[in-house]
Each structure stands twice: as structure tokens, then as C-alpha cells.
């Protein structure tokens, strides 16, 4: 990945010239955005866009630190509550600077919270063709390798997907390993033991070690129905452990998970946008 860091006294960002495909052509991406003042941000953004044009590219996405495996999205609406663990954050004027330069939303997302005491813990009917189990807490490297392999398959059809090496994925998550709670990580397995789905949830340690909130961060499956069963298992386990609130984190507006969150009583408290700009060619 080609990465350049552009920086002035009042602004900085990273420029990635080997970004994902966007409508049939490679896009650049602008990530790690920090604009201390509107003027400093405007000036640096124009410098970055000129660099993109000089590289022969006609489209750019932002904020995105190279790909969707890394940090991306601006907060576009908020109820003002503090950011949860691993949530993107930005200054209010930063997305406005992008908009003034011609960027428009290309994808929208939200996070919702739900009190766990309203969730029905009654068991679901026995699943057909797979089982759901919590992680046993052993061999986190092996667990992450399985998750990487399934993620690569499950997310390959998503917009703006870019493959990354397994080593890069492991490097991203090795700092998170000490924070993991095995009872909040679930796997769906076929009858032969092959991984068919995973769910990753983590306590919201941004609130401190005694947090009463858990974040349902990511889940994916390769077989119909497994996602529903893993989500149910996560809600039931979080409530049993003593958590009071679950955060349905960073869900694409058009994803099936969005409808599921609403059905379960999730209340949106934050919205996000990924922005894009194309030039006429």
C-alpha cells in the first residue's frame, strides 16, 4: 500500500493511492484526518486532492485509512454521548471541510443502544446444520486466524472491500487480545467443525474497567440464520454477565443487521458517513 503523510502546523492526514475499487476504478483514500482549524484543513485537503490528480486518479474516498479494515467514516449526527471503544471520532468542522470541497456521502451507518433488560432471553429453536459456541479463551492467534479467513470470504462482496494479508490483520488485533472476554465471542460451526460464522463483542472499556455496556462490534456468517443465533447468544450472555446495555455498533444503513437492531429495540444515538468525490474525466 502506497501511503503518504501530509502535514502542516494545523492539519494532517494520510494519503493512500492504492485504495479500493469504487464503481469500477481504483480510488485514493484520505485517512487519519486531523484538522485543528477550518482554514488549515481546507488548505491541506486541497493539497491532498492535487496530489491525487497528479497521480492520475479521478476519485477519492474519505475518511478512510487505506481500506475498510482500518478506521473510516465521519460522525455525522450524535446525541453527544462519549465515543465508545474503537469508535471513529472527529471534530465537527472536519466533515464540513470535505463537503465544501465537493465530497458527498457514498455510504451511511449508525450505532444504536439497547437496554438488555428488554431483550427476550428465551432459547431459539435448535439450529439446523450448525452449532453456536462461545470461544474457550485458548490460543487467541489461532482464533484470529480463523476469524480472518472467514472475514475475507464473508466481506469480499462488500462495497470498497480490499483484501489484506493475514499478518496485517493479526497486527491490527494483537493489542485488543488482552481486552477480550471469551464469553462474548461466538462461533457458528458446521457439523464437520468448519467455521461458518463469528461474532465479536467487547466491553466498552472507554467507560472504564467497570463498564456496564458491551459493544457488539462485528459479526459475519456464511450460512443463513447463523447471524441471528450468534446475536441472540451474545445478548443473552451479556445480560447474564451483568451488562445493562448493548451497543449495536457501526451498522450500514442498508444491512440486514439494521433491520434486526430496530426490531430488537435499538435506539440510534450516532450516525456516520463515508464521503466520496469524483472528477469528470
Where do the protein language model's features map onto the residues?
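A conserved beta-strand-loop-helix scaffold within acyl/acetyltransferase catalytic domains
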Residues: 1-27, 31-34, 137-219
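Short, solvent-exposed loop/turn segments at secondary-structure junctions
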Residues: 21, 66-68, 253-254
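A short, internal acetyl-CoA/4′-phosphopantetheine-binding micro-motif in the GNAT/acyltransferase core
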Residues: 31-40, 64-69, 215-226
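Conserved acetyl-CoA-binding loop-helix of GNAT-fold acetyltransferases
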Residues: 38-52, 223-240, 263
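Transmembrane-helix bundle segments that line or gate the permeation/cavity pathway
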Residues: 52, 56-69
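Active-site/acyl-donor-binding loops of N-acyltransferases
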Residues: 72-118, 184-186, 198-221, 232-281
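Acyltransferase donor/substrate-recognition loop-hinge adjacent to the catalytic core
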Residues: 91-159
Amino acid at each position: 500500500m502506497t501511503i503518504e503523510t501530509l502535514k502542516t502546523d494545523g492539519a494532517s492526514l494520510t494519503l493512500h493511492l492504492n485504495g479500493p475499487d469504487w464503481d469500477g476504478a481504483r480510488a485514493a483514500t484520505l485517512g487519519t484526518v486531523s484538522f485543528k482549524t477550518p482554514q488549515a484543513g481546507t488548505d491541506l485537503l486541497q493539497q491532498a486532492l492535487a496530489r491525487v490528480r497528479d497521480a492520475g486518479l479521478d476519485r477519492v474516498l474519505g475518511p478512510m485509512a487505506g481500506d475498510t479494515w482500518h478506521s473510516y467514516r465521519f460522525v455525522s449526527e450524535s446525541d453527544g454521548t462519549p465515543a465508545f471503544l474503537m469508535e471513529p471520532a472527529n471534530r465537527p468542522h472536519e466533515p464540513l471541510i470535505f463537503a465544501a470541497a465537493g465530497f458527498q456521502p457514498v455510504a451511511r451507518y449508525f450505532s444504536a443502544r439497547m437496554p438488555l433488560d428488554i431483550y427476550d432471553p428465551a432459547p431459539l429453536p435448535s439450529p439446523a446444520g450448525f452449532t453456536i459456541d462461545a470461544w474457550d479463551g485458548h490460543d487467541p492467534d489461532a482464533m484470529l486466524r480463523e476469524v480472518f479467513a472467514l472475514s475475507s470470504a464473508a466481506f469480499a462482496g462488500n462495497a470498497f472491500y480490499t483484501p489484506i494479508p493475514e499478518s496485517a490483520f493479526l497486527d491490527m488485533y494483537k493489542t485488543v487480545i488482552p481486552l477480550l472476554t471469551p464469553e462474548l465471542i461466538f462461533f457458528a460451526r458446521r457439523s464437520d467443525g468448519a467455521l461458518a460464522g463469528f461474532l465479536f463483542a467487547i466491553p466498552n472499556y472507554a467507560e472504564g474497567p467497570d463498564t456496564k455496556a458491551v459493544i457488539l462490534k462485528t459479526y459475519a456468517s456464511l450460512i443463513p440464520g447463523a447471524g441471528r443465533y450468534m446475536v441472540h447468544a451474545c445478548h443473552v450472555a451479556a445480560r447474564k454477565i451483568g451488562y445493562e446495555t448493548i451497543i449495536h455498533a457501526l451498522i450500514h444503513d442498508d444491512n440486514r443487521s439494521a433491520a434486526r437492531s430496530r426490531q430488537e429495540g435499538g435506539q440510534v444515538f450516532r450516525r456516520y458517513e463515508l464521503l466520496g468525490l469524483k472528477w469528470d474525466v
